[in-house]
Regions:
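Extended polybasic, low-complexity segments that bind anionic RNA or targeting/receptor surfaces
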Residues: 1-42, 46, 91-221
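Glycine/serine-rich anion-binding loops at beta->alpha junctions
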Residues: 54-90
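A short, flexible low-complexity segment enriched in Lys/Arg and Gly/Pro that occurs
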Residues: 33-68
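Residue-identity detector for glutamine
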Residues: 26, 44-49, 67, 75, ...
């Protein structure tokens, strides 16, 4: 069970945290990561692209010339694919690209991504992130203090509009959330928009202490 230092927004060490091997110390499975990233990217597609076939373009109802005796190749319509302004052969049509992953694969992919960040020393644990006002300068300073200027990904333990909007003008910065809550019938649920693609596409992954503890609670054995 690795132990990581916990820093404040100025990058100074303020404590330690024990990370579970079940979440941050597993083997990095590139095959599962590939499956998860492919599914995520496919699910972002709208699938609305469309082309017209020869039956959908206007015109072409008349045979351009008689079948034999002209010296030309025989043609039945000026809207066949080989003609200018003709229909498209085998073109795309609207369809769903959605790929569904089972819970076991999603869980394994997220654990693998987190373990990879930890092994690459691209994981930072921050005690808490509090802003008194909207301040992009403060967030840029925090990213610099933890050496995460390039494409940082921040995972908060609550929805904080000040932090979200303060990071909006930071190039490449991504803000996600992972915390526990209750639904309308009082059941405990996990609220999260953390995904494997964002983790792999980021530079350093910055977790608040509470978010890291909740992730270990949910995904630890």
């Amino acid at each position: 069970m690795p132990t990581m230092k916990v820093v404040d927004m100025a990058g100074k060490e303020v404590g330690k945290i024990k990370l579970s091997d079940d979440v941050f110390g597993q083997e990095v499975r590139s095959d599962i990561l590939h499956t998860a990233v492919r599914a995520y990217l496919l699910n972002q597609r709208q699938g609305t692209q469309s082309t017209r076939t020869r039956t959908e373009v206007s015109g072409g109802g008349k045979k351009p010339w008689r079948q034999k005796g002209t010296g030309h190749a025989r043609q039945g319509s000026t809207r066949a694919p080989q003609w200018t302004h003709g229909g498209v052969a085998l073109g795309p049509k609207p369809r769903s690209y959605r790929v569904n992953l089972d819970k076991r694969t999603k869980r394994a992919a997220l654990i693998s991504a987190l373990s990879g960040k930890c092994a690459a020393k691209e994981l930072v644990i921050v005690d808490a992130i509090k802003l008194d006002d909207y301040s992009t300068k403060t967030m840029v300073g925090m990213f610099a203090a933890v050496e995460a200027e390039k494409k940082p990904m921040l995972v908060l333990d609550s929805i904080d509009e000040r932090v979200i909007k303060s990071c909006a003008n930071v190039p490449g910065a991504k803000v996600s959330h992972f915390f526990g809550s209750e639904n309308e019938v009082g059941e405990k649920v996990v609220c999260s928009d953390v995904n494997v693609y964002d983790i792999l596409n980021s530079g350093k992954l910055i977790l608040t202490r509470a978010a890291a503890e909740k992730i270990q609670e949910v995904y630890g054995k």
